[in-house]
Amino acid sequence: MKLTERKKMILIHIAWILALAVILWPLFTIAKYDYPSADDWSFGKYMYRAMQAGEGIAGVFHAIYQTLAQNVWEARFSILILSALQPAAFGEHFYRITPYLMIGSVILSQFLLLRECIAGQAKENRWLILPIGIPMAILQVLYCPYPEESFYWYNGSVNYTFVYSLSLVLLTLYLEIALRETGKAKRVVLTVLACLLAILVGGNNFSTSVSTMCLLICLQILFLICRKDAFRRTWIVTLLETLSVLMCVTSPLTATRLNGNFGGSTANSPLMAIWLSLERTFLNIISWTNLKVLLLLVLLIPFFWKAVRKMSYEFRFPGLFTALTFGVYASQATATIYVDGTMGGGRQGAILWYFYVLWMVANVLYWCGWITKRDAIAVKAEKADLLAGKYLLRYSTCLLYTSPS
């Protein structure tokens, strides 16, 4: 029986969903043993007292205010806000939702970004979101360098893994506001949400906040040159994110923490930190680009090919795209290299890994788009689609027979 294109994609979806379920099942099974530790207690104490006193929603906001007001150490205000919402403050048994929240946020935020990027103008590409997004998520979760800090410890994971996810949602809203024609009311709602996320992301860990700032500024410059209407719609989002970062950097509490932990001195000058972040990020990429990553990219290329064929983007200057995305990615390491000379470990190493997979996929997708838009390749479109169709048939059949029953 000959399979139609729709049936092939259904089989691929089923196979990948089963694979994701198999990967996540043991990670979620041990969640019942998860328990608060370290900073969970200190940041969650006001919320715990409010819940014990039965203060309700008003108590939640008052506890967040107290956490901010009593702080004498942490300049990154978003860390204080998110840390105050520690699940065990509402009941110890709630702490087990931490890995569900963190892993779920990574997966769902990437689905949203993929939907915006590949299916925003080509609705038929919605069938490609899961076949591209699930393998990415499996690789990110399965090979996360520090899963205990990134998925199971609330205070660490919410300010790194979860904020990584918030940055992707922010980017999704940003692109939706900039590139899509929507009603005025919807655009206002999306802009307000994007502004709130910009403040939260900008006021959190410097790896995510600085790289997001660099990315938004690059997009803002591009819009100023090519799409002034998009620039007018989005400049406020970029401004708020940048101001949040600068507020954290220039806060007296940052100097207090620097004095307390490092004697008031830094390991490198700003220029040296930028140079070292480029150098070490390049070495990091080389060390991470192994057989499993290359295999993932090879498996995804047919789906990339099908996606970009239906997209209206021109995919110009792929070399410049790669250079800029490398610079944005490298900016994640600049803050820690500046302060203590390291790339950062633990939960920060995890978000470096998440972004590595994301940017690798984005670059291969972009280069595929550039190739398909070239005239020399465009005349062979029917042959390319036929090859892609044959690959999808074999791929779906293989996954169907190798997936767990």
Where are the language model's segments positioned?
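Start-transfer (signal-anchor) and selected internal transmembrane alpha helices
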Residues: 1-24, 398
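Conserved small/polar residues in nucleotide/adenosyl-binding loops
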Residues: 401-405
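Transmembrane-helix motifs of polytopic, lipid-linked glycan transferases
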Residues: 97, 101-126, 169
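Membrane-interface transmembrane helices that cradle and orient dolichyl/undecaprenyl
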Residues: 167-189
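Transmembrane catalytic cores of multi-pass membrane glycosyltransferases
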Residues: 28-97, 154, 204-351
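Membrane-interface alpha helices of multi-pass inner-membrane proteins
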Residues: 189-212
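Signature aromatic-anchored transmembrane alpha helix within multi-pass, membrane-resident enzymes
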Residues: 242, 321-322, 370-400
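Membrane-interface micro-motifs in multi-pass membrane enzymes
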Residues: 39, 129-175, 205, 330-365
